UniProtKB/Swiss-Prot annotation:
Forms a heterotetramer with UvrA during the search for lesions. Interacts with UvrC in an incision complex. Residues 461-627 form the Helicase C-terminal domain. This is UvrABC system protein B. It is found in: Cytoplasm. ATP binds at residues 69-76. Belongs to the UvrB family.
Amino acid sequence: MTIAIRTTLDEPENHSDFVPHRPSRPEKTEPSKPFRLVSDYEPAGDQPQAISALCKDIQKGERDQVLLGVTGSGKTFTMAKVIEKLQRPSLILAPNKILAAQLYGEFKRFFPENAVEFFVSYYDYYQPEAYVPRTDTYIEKDSAINEAIDRMRHAATRSLLEREDVIIVASVSCLYGIGSVDTYSSMTFRLLKGQLVDQREIIRRLVALQYKRNEVAFGRGSFRVKGDTLEIFPSHYEDMAWRISFFGDEIEEISEFDPLTGVKIAKLDQIKIYANSHYVTPEPTLKAANNAIRRELDNRLREFKAEGKLLEAQRLEERTEFDLEMMAATGACSGIENYSRFLTGRAPGEPPPTLFEYLPDNALLFVDESHQTIPQINGMSRGDYRRKTTLADYGFRLPSCIDNRPLRFEEWNAMRPQTVYVSATPGPWELEQTGGVFVEQIIRPTGLVDPAIEVRPIEEQVDNLIFEAKKTAAAGWRSLVTTLTKRMAEDLTEYMYEAGLKVRYMHSDVETIERIELIRDLRLGVYDVLIGINLLREGLDIPECGLVAVLDADKEGFLRSETSLIQTIGRAARNAEGRVILYGDKITGSMARAMAETERRRIKQIAWNKAHNITPATVKRQVDDIVGHFGVVNSSEAAATIENHDPKVLARSISETEKEMLEAAANLEFEKAAQLRDVLHQLKRQELGLPPEKSSEIQGRSEAGRPGTRKTRSDKAREAKASKRVKQEAGEKLLRSRGH
C-alpha cells in the first residue's frame, strides 16, 4: 500500500464532477423496529398539509425542499411525522450544541423504541494549535474531552452500522473527520458462547482497539482480568459491561452486568466489540503511514534547507521524529489528527471520512435553522486552512496537516442525501436550490399568533426595560433581553440586579451545558430575566417568555438584520400574552421588513382562529432535563417522580440514590454528588411524610451568568487546566493509597 505525499500547500478545488467516497458498509446484525411516533397529539394547523407535501416530493425523488415554519408551529413534530411516514433513517443537523441537545430530547420522546443518537463535538474546552509569526508565539493545543459525549458519539456510529431504525441528531461538528467506515467496521470482532479462543488473543485485540487494562478504576473503554473471567466495558455503554467466563480456551458464558454492583443483568449468546476510538488504525496501515510520513518529511526538509530555513527544518524534524516514535510504540501520539490522511490512505486534497460516509444510502437529512447552519458549513474550512498553512510554513507541522479539516461546502453538497431545510427565515441558497418554492407552516396547532411589536425610543431604554420586566415578572412570566456586546450584557445584568430583579446573562463565554442549565432555571422561575446577544434566537423553547426586548434595534447590522429580528421576535410566540419591544429612534429597513413579515403572519393566523373558533392558549410544557444524558442530576424533578409511591419503592430509591452519591464522590464528581445529596434529602422528606410547604424551594443549577461573574477565555483556560491537574493529582494519590 503506497500513500501519496503532499508536495505543496495549495488547496485543490473540487470541480462539479467531484464524486464523493461511498465506502461499503457491513451487513446490519441487530433487529430493527419500525419508526413509531409516540405522542398525545395529532397533526393540526398547517402540519397535515406540510407533512403530506414533504413526503410526496421526497417519494418523487426531489433532492431539496424548504419547510418555512414559524416559531411554535411544531416543525420538530412535522419532521418526526415525515420520518415515521417514510420509514427512513435520518440525520438532523443543528447549528449548535444547545439546539442539538433540545432536538435530541424531543426525538428521544417521540421515538422511544428506536435508536435516537447524539453526535456533537466532545470537547468541553478546545484551544487549537496555532502560531503567530508577528509575535513569534506558538500556542500548543489544549483540550478537555467530555467522556459522556464521547460515549454517545460511539453509540451513534455503532447504531448506524448495526441498525436500520436510526435517527442521529448532530451539530455541524459532524463535518470534521473521524475514522473511515471500512477501518472502523473491519476492526470489530465477535465473541460467541462456546467459541474456542485464547484469552490472551482477545486481550491483544482489545489493546489494538485502544482499550486499556485497568484493574482499579473499571470504566468505559477499559477491561480487567480475574482468573478465568474477562470483563469488558464497551465504548458505547454508560452503565453496563460484559463478563466473559472461560473454561480453558472455551467461552463458557457471556453475560451483561452492572459494573457498580456486579449484579448479572442478562445472559448473551454473542457480543460484537467496537473500537474505543474512531481513529483506530490496523498495523499494516500504520507501517505504510510511517513510510509516507518519512517521505514527506525528507521532501520538506530539502525544501527548507534549500531556502535557508534551518530553524524551521530542525524544528520539523525533531517534532515529526518524536511523533513517529510514539506511534510506533503506542499506536498514537499527541496531535495524531495532523497525520489523519496517512492513516486513512487518502490522496492529498481529498475530503476526510466523516459521519456522512456512515449514513445509509436511503437516509434523509433535515437541516434545522438552515439560515444559520448553511453559512456555518460554508465558512468552516476556510479559517482552518489559514491556521494550518501558517503551522506548515514555519516548520511546526508537515504540509499534510491541512488535510485534517472539515468538509468544504461543495464536498458536503455532493455527499448529502435528500434534504429538507427547516427555518422560519430560509436563506437565499436554500431557496435557490428549490427555485424559490417552499412548504409553509404558519398556523400553530395551539392557535397562538405572532406577538404584537412595539417600537420605543432609545432614550431611557434601560429604565423603561426594568419597569416592563418587573411588570412581566409580576404576571408570572419571564423576559428575554438582547444587547449588542458581551460587556453590555454583563453590565446590564448588574444594573438590573441592583434594581431588584432576578437576572442572569448568557453569551459565548458561558459553557454549553451551563447555557442549557440557565434556560432550565429561567423556565422554572429561579430568575426572571435572561440577557444575551446572539444566543437568544433560534430554537429556544421558552413558553414562559412573556416579553422580548431588543435594545438598540436601529443599529443596522448582523445582530439587527431582518433574519435576526424575526428569530428574536419568535421567542415570544409561544405565549398567548407574549409581546415584543424594539428600542430604536428610527425604523431601519430590517426592522420594517421584520415587522411587516410578522404582521403578515398575524393576519393569517388571526383569520384562521376566527374561522375555526380557536382561542389561543399558552403552550404548557414540563421543564425537561435536557442534560440528563450528560451525567447531570435533576434534583427537583428526580425527587418528584417518586411521589405517591409505596414505602418499599421509596426505600429502594433512597438506597439507590445514596449508592450513586457515594460513587460520584469516589469518582471526584463532587457537583454530581452534591446534587444527588439534595435528591436524597428530598426523598427522605417524603419518607417522613412532610407536607410540600415544608420542602425547599426550587434551586437553580447553573452558577454561570450571575451578576459580577465576568470571565475571560483565558480565565476559563486556567480553570480548565487547574481542574485537570487537581483531578490528576487526586487520582495519583488514590492509587498510592491503594498500594499501586
